[in-house]
Amino acid sequence: LTGSISLYYKTVQNINYSHCQWHGVRQRLTCWFDGPAYITQCPIQAGQSFKYRFTLLNQRGTLFWHAHISWLRATVHGPLIIYPKQGVGYPFQPPVEEHVIILGEYWLRDVQGLERHVKESGGGPPGSDAYTLNGLLGPLHNCSRDDIYTINVTKGKNYLLRIINAALNMEHFFMVANHTMTVVETDGEYTKPFKTTFLMLTPGQTYNVLIKADQSIGKYFMAMAPYMPAKNAPFLKKTSYGILRYASPTVKVDKLARKSHVKTSMTPLEPIIPNVNDTASVQAFSDQVKRLYPNHQWSPVDVPLRIDKTLFFTIGLNAGGIFAASVNNVTFRRPTVSLLNAYYNNLQGYYSTDFPDKPEKMYDFVNGAPNNISVDTQPAIGTQVSILEHGWAVQVIFQDTGTVGTEKHPIHLHGFSFYLLGTGLGNYNSSTALLNLYDPPYRNTVGVPVGRWAVIRFRADNPGMWFMHCHLEVHTTWGLSMAFLVKNGKGKMQNLPPPPLDLPLC
């Protein structure tokens, strides 16, 4: 789809501030409307409004929008579905229906208070109180036994499920009992179809899957369950259920009782759920995601082969009495003004342009920092950005670190999609790393695996200030983020336009 959009966003009086980020929208020449607080705009204060204006250029598929300040994303989120333009279909058999499924977390406590507690205490947050499918907790909680998200299907028909992980701090499995899913899209980009019995989505990722109603008439649980590869991290060890229900005049719509192991046509069948830390299965699943076809009209592959800038980014947690997180041992400090506004108006003192291209010291990253190298465990704190010339082909190597403990980090880049060329176990070695330049997936969020590395490439052809951060909200709070400043080009349509007149002020 190509088309312009204007969206009016207002912060209601009982919220101090908010704003909206259009996750996955590449915002071509519209960086002012990208949305992250203190990066491209100031928050929209209570009672104020701001009109987002941007063009969807050669994009389609399942994306989503969410708040991008504090932990308001816990409940302030929703789907953004971009359909193919008229006359252009799907590269697969059209489904009879489609359904959006948003995976989320439910908190009994005020999430803004939780964020303040994390900052003030220096510790980690507790796990959420429940997981939700489209806002519903499902049958395993006393308060919600009848609040179950349900999809009605007709035997023999095909359905498209658009699945979004909007959770704050948890990666999740998704599966449907006795059904195989065919993956056809990730992060709004078509993929080579492949069959799977489960998905694993990091926060910020989306998957489109086809599912055929080819089982016996009855009910089947749709399940979301936590994936937690990090050791000793607190999280809710619980599953939430929805129902896939086959329509039939002989099956009555009964109230669902407690989870039962009795398998009848009236009791939903349960899926087989992977172990909570089954990293091998998750890696095998992720490795199947490929671009549709290298030279196909639906998704041409244009991987930059000549690299202008290579960046080696270590990512992970730090500890020195309090938890911190960093990129190249720099913990990001959010400024008090919008970085984009500071850049455009040449405001001094709000950021520096010396973000390191690589770690100060090289060592065995995965197995932890040597105790005698304090710089590797005590991060610097600052608001530093990395400068990219317009049009540069950029390669970024993400390296997970084990200073506190290895963990999976879903890294999201604003303003661009990127080619995920490969991942590998241990410390990155350019002489042995196997990179896929033929049909790599095109994504906006990459789950850097536990104790592994990941390599991406993109072309920096969109001027502006672009945030890159871990989509586990607690890690962003601790500072696992940075920003790229992409400079103006010399040609037509290569310069950042002036700010809108109604841009919120700090």
Each PLM stretch: what is its role?
Residues 76-103, 235-276, 435, 478-506:
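Extracytoplasmic/periplasmic copper-protein system
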Residues 95-167, 265-279, 309, 316-318, ...:
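Acidic-aromatic/histidine active-site loop/patch
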Residues 56, 69, 82-84, 103-105, ...:
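Short, structured patches in soluble enzyme cores that scaffold and shape functional sites
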Residues 255-312, 322-324, 334-337, 342-360, ...:
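Intrinsic disorder/low-complexity detector
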Residues 1-92, 170-199, 219-236, 321-459, ...:
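Histidine- and aromatic-enriched segments that form or immediately flank copper-ligand environments
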